[in-house]
């Protein structure tokens, strides 16, 4: 199966991968191509930018959370509706688990036969750029098909870098992005700001286009040389019945995996999005609640003033609506949240705890082992996901945590569970254990039937 595709990888984090990926997507769209974006790894923020620009959801390709056959399936899905796929890498090209390249962008490129375009930072470089590219070429071989240079001072500077690389490495240099602070994406305590928070994303893309000078035809040629895919298709899951699941989605809650939404829909769920931040309430006939991660600590004051949203969510949960809350959603369900301003604000009040920020970033892959048989997992069953926060939850009542999280060197209890609520700091990827979304939808269907009878 022909699926033209290319990976935009970096020498390291902060080199301009996301900016370059957006520049490439924009240039391909301007050629009239339909672009399918992807992100290597567990990131929730970069895909928002991809999706907004491409007009198509950006899927995560994560070799640790997602079984390999599903990775091939996700890539093959692009063959029917898109002309080309652009995959943004994660961290540096070879950065994987520990000191190995397992799970890295290069690992994904090898497994899927996808050519790599390497992004290097040209600031303060000329001939030395060749040594950088040669080193990466030694590790990646023929998969390294091109280079794009960021933070270039002008055409003459670019010509020096281009000649040095092409004369010494036989790797094509496909263009550059000028050094310009106006196209640098801002950051906050958990990474880049969200796409929804840029004042005008279209203006940003226009500014980026003006300082981007890339060989689009060369990128298309490289993408078309990708190895053919031979995915083993199997249905993600067949429909189990209808349920209406209300999903909290706004600037405070938008750390979700698009693949999770797709699986829920395949099972028969109708997803209805609402904004707690804007004091929107879930529909009265809601059969389930899904409250994902995000930045409730940044918007704690506004969430506190959104009284209708908080009270209606609490009311639905107390009525027995099956509820899945992850990270920021877990924080929101607590009694109080200490915001970034240090002030304590009311949360939904379901979880008997207080949330506050710390200076410590907790980040990484997690394997969940269930200590209980609950709505999502049976005792001893596992799932995989990602943890990403600077907050901690301090329980005010004694609770039995439903999960044990496996770290590299230790185990730690996590989460909150009641009859109809499962909450955890971990963003679970449903493709790591497809029993989870199936059970969630089935619980929602059971609740729907009980609600209709009453």
UniProtKB/Swiss-Prot annotation:
Q: In which pathway does it act?
A: Cofactor biosynthesis; adenosylcobalamin biosynthesis; cob(II)yrinate a,c-diamide from sirohydrochlorin (anaerobic route): step 10/10
Q: Which InterPro entries match?
A: CbiA/CobB_synth, Class_I_gatase-like, CobQ/CobB/MinD/ParA_Nub-bd_dom, GATase_3, P-loop_NTPase
- Could you name the active-site residues? 327 (nucleophile)
Q: Where is the GATase cobBQ-type domain?
A: 244-435
Reactions that this protein is recorded to catalyse: cob(II)yrinate + 2 L-glutamine + 2 ATP + 2 H2O = cob(II)yrinate a,c diamide + 2 L-glutamate + 2 ADP + 2 phosphate + 2 H(+)
Q: Which domain of life is it from?
A: Archaea
Q: Which UniProt keywords apply?
A: ATP-binding, Cobalamin biosynthesis, Glutamine amidotransferase, Ligase, Magnesium, Nucleotide-binding
Q: EC number(s) of the enzyme?
A: 6.3.5.11
Does the keyword field hold ATP-binding? yes
Q: Which residues are annotated as site, described as Increases nucleophilicity of active site Cys?
A: 427
A biological process term (GO) from this entry: cobalamin biosynthetic process
Fill in the domain comment: Comprises of two domains. The C-terminal domain contains the binding site for glutamine and catalyzes the hydrolysis of this substrate to glutamate and ammonia. The N-terminal domain is anticipated to bind ATP and cobyrinate and catalyzes the ultimate synthesis of the diamide product. The ammonia produced via the glutaminase domain is probably translocated to the adjacent domain via a molecular tunnel, where it reacts with an activated intermediate.
- What does the UniProt record say this protein does? Catalyzes the ATP-dependent amidation of the two carboxylate groups at positions a and c of cobyrinate, using either L-glutamine or ammonia as the nitrogen source.
Tell me which family the UniProt entry assigns to this protein: Belongs to the CobB/CbiA family.
Q: What else is known?
A: The a and c carboxylates of cobyrinate are activated for nucleophilic attack via formation of a phosphorylated intermediate by ATP. CbiA catalyzes first the amidation of the c-carboxylate, and then that of the a-carboxylate.
Q: What protein name does the entry list? A: Cobyrinate a,c-diamide synthase
Its gene is cbiA
């Amino acid at each position: 199966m022909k699926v033209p595709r290319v990976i935009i990888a970096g020498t390291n984090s902060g080199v301009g991968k996301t900016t370059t990926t957006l520049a490439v997507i924009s240039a391909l769209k301007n050629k009239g191509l339909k672009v399918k974006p992807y992100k290597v790894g567990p990131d929730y923020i970069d895909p928002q930018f991809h999706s907004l620009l491409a007009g198509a959801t950006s899927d995560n390709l994560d070799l640790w959370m997602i079984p390999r056959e599903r990775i091939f399936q996700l890539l093959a899905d692009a063959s029917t509706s898109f002309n080309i796929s652009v995959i943004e890498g994660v961290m540096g090209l070879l950065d994987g688990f520990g000191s190995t390249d397992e799970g890295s962008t290069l690992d994904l490129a090898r497994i899927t036969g996808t050519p790599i375009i390497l992004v290097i930072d040209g600031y303060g470089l000329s001939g030395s750029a060749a040594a950088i590219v040669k080193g990466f070429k030694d590790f990646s071989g023929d998969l390294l098909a091109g280079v794009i240079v960021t933070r270039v001072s002008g055409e003459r500077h670019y010509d020096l870098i281009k000649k040095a690389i092409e004369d010494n490495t036989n790797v094509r240099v496909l263009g550059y992005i000028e050094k310009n602070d106006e196209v640098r994406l801002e950051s906050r305590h958990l990474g880049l700001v969200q796409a929804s928070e840029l004042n005008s994303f279209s203006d940003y893309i226009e500014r980026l286009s003006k300082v981007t000078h890339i060989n689009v035809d060369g990128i298309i040629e490289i993408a078309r040389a990708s190895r053919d895919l031979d995915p083993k298709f199997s249905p993600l899951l067949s429909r189990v019945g209808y349920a209406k699941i209300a999903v909290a989605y706004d600037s405070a809650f938008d750390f979700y995996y698009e693949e999770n939404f797709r699986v829920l829909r395949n099972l028969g769920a109708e997803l209805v999005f609402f904004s707690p931040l804007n004091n929107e309430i879930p529909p009265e006939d809601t059969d389930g609640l899904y409250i994902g991660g995000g930045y409730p600590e940044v918007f704690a004051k506004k969430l506190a003033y959104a009284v209708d949203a908080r009270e209606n969510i609490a009311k639905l949960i107390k009525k027995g609506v099956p509820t899945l809350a992850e990270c920021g959603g877990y924080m929101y369900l607590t009694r109080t949240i200490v915001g970034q301003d240090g002030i304590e604000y009311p949360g939904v009040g379901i979880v008997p705890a207080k949330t506050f920020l710390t200076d410590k970033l907790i980040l990484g892959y997690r394997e969940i082992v269930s200590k209980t048989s609950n709505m999502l997992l049976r005792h001893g069953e596992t799932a995989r996901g990602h943890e990403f926060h600077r907050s901690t939850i301090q329980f005010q009542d004694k609770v039995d945590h439903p999960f044990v999280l496996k770290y590299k060197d230790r185990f730690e209890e996590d989460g909150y569970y009641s009859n109809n609520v499962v909450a955890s700091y971990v963003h679970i990827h449903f493709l790591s254990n497809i029993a989870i979304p199936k059970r969630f939808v089935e619980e929602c269907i059971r609740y729907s039937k009980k609600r209709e009878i009453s």
